[in-house]
Amino acid sequence: VEEDGYITELGYQLGKNYDDPQWDSLLDQLTKEEMENLYLHGYVRNNELPSIGKPTTREVDGPSQAGSFNRASFGTGYPNAGTMAQTWNAELAGIYGQSIGQQAAHLGYDGLYAPATNMHRSPFDGRNYEYYSEDSLLSGTMCGKTVEGAKQAGIYMYVKHFICNDGESGMYRDAVYTWMTEQALREIYLKPFQMLVEDYGATALMSSYNRIGAVWAGGSEALLTSILRDEWGFHGAVVTDY
């Protein structure tokens, strides 16, 4: 990260270990106003932090297109994830990821709220068109290759929805309580995300609206810290759904 030809403090810190104590020193330099702006006013973007030289980054929705209701610029509309999965062609998924990533970059975006890799648990799920399959391995492979392709184009992807957003219908997605055994959770629903982190180097995820048991997925320490970071070694960012 540069400013007027000089590397900023953030620029020097990039590439350091996730647990490097210098990150704490860097964060201590943020002003109250900057932290407020970062957390409260970051709709489809990550705001600038002038004190440490962090620029604004812009994101856009759309698993099948770089563009959505929240942006005026649109890229090409691609076949949905289910159609892609039916090809069983991981190489094609990588090409798709690179293509949509290049379009996002051309339109001035830095990241995408995509792809989505929840399960086709029921034909009545209102978001099935965004998801690949009822098969965890196929979903994780196709999604992982898509993320790899976008990364080659310089675009990061917030893969969604972590986790179990498999029963959304109408406007009640924030009131869905999901119950299952831990074995089912790990072997079916978490598996694609585990592959993304451990095998494909995913750096960003989007949490889901629903609850796992009685705990909101976006506020679950068991999911977001114990499993995602402590077990899988995820060092990236998690954004809540909106």
Ranges and model annotations:
Residues 1-242:
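Glycoside hydrolase catalytic-domain context in secreted enzymes
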